[in-house]
């Protein structure tokens, strides 16, 4: 074949290049390349845009997400500050406790597994033997108290059975990763459980058919938490308050000083693994917690105990329906030494009201309108009976009311008409304004008309012409109505306001009521003024009464009451100190001196006036009783108004240091409603114990060498017996510790009636037996006289010191180990 010429070759080449298929292929190649370039550029743009969004625009957010995944941020719980009484005794503290929990889904030793060959599904079944063994061992430790005394646990008790079943049921939940086995467990029990779990898992690391051991493990862990402890239970509960389940102050000082007590939590930031667990990291960042500060109170546990004890006795003896309250306060500084509202609650278990349930139920049903416990129809209207009376709800849940009542601090949350106690304030108004002096006389004819109202004194008695001191002792309503008229509505209101009755006292406690019930100056008409002058028109709180009376006797200064004396850090260093805060001067010193005189005249030596029952031999005491009708409350079943019996005392009367106040809300004593009989003795009893303790100045008479004849107290009510002994300078003790005996009559006493005993001797009174109880005489030889006296007193014995009181006891009149009646006089000879 002849080859084409070179010329023809060029033409052939041109023909080939012009092939359309080749041209299309070339275009595709160019397009593909361009598309690839565009795609790469676009992808790069998207990546760059994404990187821009991630790194720059939203960089902070994504870095935060990364940190959250890579870092573990743990809270370091601050320790809550403690609360102490004035002498450093702990009233509230925080302890470390543990929550014991299990992960049943990871506890392979408690379950057996089987696989379905057809479906491949794995099922787990409980191993009863393993569950029983583990549940038993954990329950024994939980109930042992110390994690060691397992043999002491009664496995037949209901407590054991309940705890065992709870643990068994929790461990049986194979699909659950978290089951609480127990809360608030102490460290000893927690360690014991940990040791048991470790030993169990070690023993089951490998299967041992000969020993019947299956391979597996149990997963039981613990979480640290804190528990608020109140070592004295219901003691001063209304003041201390309590914390909720999360540790936040909910009531009382715990609430008002929450930010001070709580402290500031810290943090630890460290790396964590894929399972969320912390990795050991030397670069971990820790922000230490700042523990809470401590509160040191003006409250004194010894004074508080005395106030609570006698208040409880009075509530029981007089069948008080609506609780009672007591306050002991420094009149010059406002420091509260004791504050009680009874019945109250145990802050260790503040939600529990069972101890007071019967009392609270009766109280709620006595005030159905107040608590709204009537049965309602679906439309919200009340169900009524055939006579149109509202019907009580028989299935109502009153638990919320019960808790609210027992939590309330009655001294600051509830209003009442003060009654005749207010006459002290009216007297102060009159003297300071120049409308009266101690010698101002007014006539009481037994009845007095104001507008359309006619007023009487108690029992409609006519007191005749009397001066200010006599009128206060006689508690003459008509005298003080006339004095109020002399003062006039405008000036009366100004003083009422100045004494602090139109505002809160400012005490450092939460929930002080801001609801005030009084007549404004423009509405204080002649009838309202008349009723207000003797305390029956304006409602106030007990603490308002105490601060006003304090101002009336301390030179005229209204002070802010306080419970916290100082705030300290964890090392005891004082951060803040609370001193006296004088709000204003209300009356002059000269007017205050007059008020002190007429209040002392009210109590005198215990032989005159309604206040005499508060007298304690050896002390100058001023006081005033008040029996008021609660016009704003439902009436009693007999149609009479409910009463409040109260009494306030100050001492020493010439230069008062402390005030003692007691109020009984709606006493149902079968014999009387009078506060001079019901409340005054309670105040006297409190004074009889706290005055010597505080070192209150006496009346100046040296009675150390005197003897007193013991009166015959058999057949007397316990409260009357106390008054008789206080007046003579003898101490007293109810032999039964049960406050319910306080209203009974004395059936036996020792020392016996007629015995000559040293001043200050304790007379033991019995209300349930005709035979005195016996006690063993301690051996006090070789002891100092003071220590011997303390030992004998602790055994319930009285003491007479003979010889050199600065020496040691050489002899004792009753042999050591002898059994004698409580109250027996033991003479110790010292040398």
Regions found by a protein language model. Name each.
Residues 1-391, 415, 490-497, 616-617, ...:
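Periplasmic/cell-envelope proteins involved in peptidoglycan metabolism and beta-lactam response
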Residues 76-79, 86, 93-97, 176, ...:
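Extracytoplasmic
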Residues 78, 125-133, 183-187, 247-251, ...:
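Soluble non-cytosolic domains of exported or imported proteins
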Residues 92, 98, 273-287, 332-421, ...:
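Beta-lactam-recognizing serine transpeptidase/beta-lactamase-like catalytic domain environment
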Residues 139-148, 198, 244, 262, ...:
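Sec-exported extracytoplasmic/periplasmic mature domains
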Residues 150-169, 320-333, 382, 443-447, ...:
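Acidic/histidine-enriched alpha-helical segments
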Residues 578, 618, 632, 662-831:
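Ligand-recognition elements built from short beta-strands and adjacent flexible loops
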């Amino acid at each position: 074949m002849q080859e084409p010429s070179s010329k023809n070759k060029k033409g052939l080449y041109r023909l080939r290049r012009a092939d359309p298929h080749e041209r299309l292929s070339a275009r595709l190649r160019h397009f593909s390349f361009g598309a690839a370039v565009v795609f790469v550029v676009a992808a790069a743009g998207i990546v760059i845009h994404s990187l821009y969004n991630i790194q720059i625009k939203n960089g902070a957010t994504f870095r935060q997400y990364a940190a959250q995944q890579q870092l573990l941020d743990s809270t370091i719980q601050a320790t809550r500050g403690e609360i102490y009484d004035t002498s450093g005794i702990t009233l509230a503290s925080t302890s470390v406790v543990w929550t014991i929990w299990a992960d049943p889904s990871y506890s392979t030793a408690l379950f057996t597994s089987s696989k379905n060959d057809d479906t491949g599904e794995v099922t787990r079944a409980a191993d009863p033997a393993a569950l029983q063994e583990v549940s038993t061992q954990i329950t024994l430790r939980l109930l042992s108290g110390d994690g060691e005394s397992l043999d002491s646990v009664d496995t037949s008790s209901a407590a054991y059975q309940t705890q065992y079943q709870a643990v068994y049921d929790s461990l049986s939940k194979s699909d659950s990763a978290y089951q609480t086995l127990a809360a608030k467990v102490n460290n000893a029990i927690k360690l014991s459980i940990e040791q048991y779990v470790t030993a169990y898992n070690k023993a089951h690391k490998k299967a041992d058919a000969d020993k019947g051991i299956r391979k597996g493990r149990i997963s039981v862990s613990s979480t640290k938490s804190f528990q608020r402890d109140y070592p004295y239970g219901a003691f001063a509960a209304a003041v201390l308050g309590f914390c909720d389940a999360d540790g936040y102050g909910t009531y009382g000082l715990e609430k008002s000083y929450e930010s001070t007590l709580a402290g500031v939590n810290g943090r630890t930031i460290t790396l964590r693994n894929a399972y969320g667990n912390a990795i050991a990291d030397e670069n971990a960042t820790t922000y230490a917690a700042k523990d809470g500060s401590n509160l040191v109170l003006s409250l004194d546990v010894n004074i508080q105990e005395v106030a609570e004890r006698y208040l409880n006795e009075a509530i029981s003896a007089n069948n008080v329906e609506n609780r009672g309250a007591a306050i002991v306060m420094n009149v010059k500084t406002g420091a509260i030494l004791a504050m009680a509202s009874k019945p109250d609650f145990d802050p260790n278990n503040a939600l529990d009201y069972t101890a007071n349930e019967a009392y609270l139920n009766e109280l709620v049903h006595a005030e159905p309108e107040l608590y709204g416990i009537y049965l309602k129809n679906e439309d919200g209207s009340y169900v009524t009976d055939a006579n149109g009376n509202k019907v009580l709800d028989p299935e109502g849940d009153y638990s919320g009311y019960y808790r609210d009542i027992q939590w309330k601090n009655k001294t600051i949350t509830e209003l009442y008409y003060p009654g005749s106690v207010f006459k002290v304030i009216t007297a102060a108004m009159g003297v300071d304004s120049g409308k009266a002096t101690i010698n101002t006389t007014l006539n009481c004819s037994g009845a007095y008309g104001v507008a359309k109202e006619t007023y009487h004194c108690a029992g409609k008695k006519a007191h005749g012409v009397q001066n200010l001191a006599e009128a206060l002792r006689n508690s003459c309503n008509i005298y003080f109505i006339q004095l109020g008229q002399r003062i006039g509505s405008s000036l009366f209101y100004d003083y009422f306001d100045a004494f602090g009755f139109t505002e809160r006292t400012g005490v450092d406690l939460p929930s002080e009521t801001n609801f005030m019930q009084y007549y404004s100056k423009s509405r204080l008409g002649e009838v309202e003024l008349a009723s207000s002058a003797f305390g029956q028109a304006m409602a106030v709180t007990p603490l308002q009464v105490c601060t006003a009376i304090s101002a009336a006797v301390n030179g005229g200064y209204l002070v802010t009451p306080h419970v916290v004396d100082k705030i300290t850090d964890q090392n005891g260093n004082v951060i803040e100190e609370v001193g006296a805060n004088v709000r204003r001067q209300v009356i002059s010193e000269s007017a205050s001196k007059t008020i002190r005189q007429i209040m002392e005249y009210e109590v005198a030596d215990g032989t005159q006036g309604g206040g005499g029952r508060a007298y304690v031999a050896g002390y100058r005491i001023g006081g005033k009783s008040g029996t008021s009708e609660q016009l704003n409350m439902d009436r009693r079943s007999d149609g009479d108004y409910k009463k409040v019996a109260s009494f306030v005392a100050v001492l020493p009367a010439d230069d008062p240091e402390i005030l003692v106040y007691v109020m009984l809300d709606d006493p149902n004593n079968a014999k009387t409603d009078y506060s001079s009989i019901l409340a005054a003795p309670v105040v006297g009893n409190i004074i009889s114990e706290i005055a010597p303790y505080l070192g209150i100045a006496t009346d100046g008479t040296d009675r150390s060498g005197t003897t007193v004849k013991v009166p015959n107290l058999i057949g007397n009510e316990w409260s009357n017996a106390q008054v008789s002994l206080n007046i003579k300078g003898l101490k007293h003790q109810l032999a039964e510790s049960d406050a319910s005996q306080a209203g009974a009559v004395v059936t036996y006493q020792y020392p016996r009636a007629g015995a000559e005993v040293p001043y200050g001797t304790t007379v033991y009174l019995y209300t349930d037996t005709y035979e005195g109880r016996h006690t063993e005489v301690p051996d006090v030889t070789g002891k100092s006289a003071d220590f011997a006296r303390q030992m004998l007193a602790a055994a319930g014995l009285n003491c007479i010191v003979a010889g050199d009181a600065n020496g040691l006891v050489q002899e004792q009149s009753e042999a050591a180990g002898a059994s004698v009646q409580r109250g027996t006089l033991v003479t110790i000879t010292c040398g």
